[in-house]
Amino acid sequence: MTGLMNLTARNCKLFFKDKGMFFTSLITPGILLILYSTFLANVYKESFVSNLPEFFSPSESIIDAMVGGQLVASLLAVCCVTVAFCSNLLMTQDKVSGAIKDITVSPVKGSTVALSYFLASEISTLIISFAALGISLAYLAFCGWYLSAADIFLIILDVFLLTLFGTALSSLIN
């Protein structure tokens, strides 16, 4: 268990120490939100309004909140997977640099090494994804807020599950 904790801590430290990888992972959700809200918000809104029945006309704030919710959902779905791939590049870097040979020589099982990469990638992805969630909730507060505390809890749970999926997918591919 100590070997797993030490390797996981090592992998997390290396991810956050690499400023380029960390900064890219952190700024990507913000850039995507700006691009989504700038270019896709009007397309979503027009599509949403055009598909409403004529006898039903919700207020502009409800439509804006619905469009914002769709944008945030797509942003979080994309970020939880792409950030997982970015944070899992550490495994590839260790293979390229030969550091994995040093790790495999140590008296630690291969499954422990693989699990440490997975856990470190999950922790790193969760931190970045929760930062993206904070940015997204700020955007929703700006364009229209109709969420309850239970909704926020379910969104947090969804982000956690999405990061598990993204990390598992990136670990499987790497």
Describe each region flagged by the PLM.
Residues M1-A9, G166:
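Short, membrane-interfacial amphipathic segments enriched in basic
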